[in-house]
Amino acid sequence: MADKKLDTQLVNAGRSKKYTLGAVNSVIQRASSLVFDSVEAKKHATRNRANGELFYGRRGTLTHFSLQQAMCELEGGAGCVLFPCGAAAVANSILAFIEQGDHVLMTNTAYEPSQDFCSKILSKLGVTTSWFDPLIGADIVKHLQPNTKIVFLESPGSITMEVHDVPAIVAAVRSVVPDAIIMIDNTWAAGVLFKALDFGIDVSIQAATKYLVGHSDAMIGTAVCNARCWEQLRENAYLMGQMVDADTAYITSRGLRTLGVRLRQHHESSLKVAEWLAEHPQVARVNHPALPGSKGHEFWKRDFTGSSGLFSFVLKKKLNNEELANYLDNFSLFSMAYSWGGYESLILANQPEHIAAIRPQGEIDFSGTLIRLHIGLEDVDDLIADLDVGFARIV
């Protein structure tokens, strides 16, 4: 299927007859105990328990295997581990490869829980973490240490949406610490708009809760990795008891079938909104990777095949508490909620000092209130009209 276009891959990935048993979709196989017909069958399952053979519920069922196979086909990986959420995927992927005395190098624009895991959990295990600017490129060599075991990327960055120069970073890391494991939180690109493993990254992690599920009604994380990382990542996750239920795996597989159509609409609508915002007199700047002038836009243009629905913009004005509540409380189409990636449009706000507080170096370069949008599948003109009315509330 690698020679087929993305939409064709998304429709067909993981849908072998072994997993569908004659239906269109993979079967939902809920099981803890899986029965062996004979002693020899038990021995066979035991020998092949890590290679897609039915063995025990914690190793997975046909439903899980179908999704894992699909993710490997889509991201070009040797294996895929499923986790109960994106944060679990990040934490357990890191844990699989570090030990006392190691060093983790993480972008300072990583998702806040990813940063907290390093600073609050890994620090107790004798693992140090330091941070790098997302636009550092080849200069990342200045932050590498002999004991650097993991380099963790997130592109675009959380909230402020900076795009890494991934080829420059990967080349620099390989030249200094060639055995380091390079990971990326690839959620924004849904694992398909940026093919991380093709760029030399070892582990591509997603909160599949977002675009893969696509309907804001299930939580799941994925980690797709290359051959050198697969066994260690797989076995660590198994020993840590990481798994998802069959129904969630099924919902995620079903979400893949419409992912291409949804992503195109997210791209088209979010870029139209971003372009409109860029011309608005109350907006200081727009952080959208596909918009010229956004930080790292040139790397997005070179390395990505599209964009999704999440971006942010900065107001020229810093809203006080009353103004902010009046602004956020009165939208008709934008809801306030954490997460994103569903069919619905969402809005949240951050004050500059709050963003500075969750950045390791505390550095930000704006003074107005930041607004984060997820542009859903509603008519884009209706969304722009709702935003336009919102601006009238904060004049």
Label the model's feature ranges:
Residues 1-61, 69, 371:
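N-terminal "arm"/small-domain region of PLP-dependent enzymes with the aminotransferase-like
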Residues 2, 10-19, 80-280, 287, ...:
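Conserved PLP-enzyme active-site core in the AAT-like
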Residues 3, 10-27, 323-360:
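C-terminal core of ALDH-fold dehydrogenases
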Residues 38-88, 113-120:
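Conserved N-terminal alpha-helix of the aminotransferase class I/II PLP-enzyme fold
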Residues 76, 147, 282-285, 333, ...:
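Glycine-centered tight turns that cap/initiate beta-strands
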Residues 119-120, 128-130, 149, 262, ...:
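PLP-dependent enzyme catalytic core of the Aspartate aminotransferase-like
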Residues 224, 312-314, 374-376:
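Short hydrophobic/aromatic beta-strand micro-patches
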Residues 271-332, 336-341, 355-362:
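Conserved small-domain helix->loop->beta segment predominantly found in fold-type I
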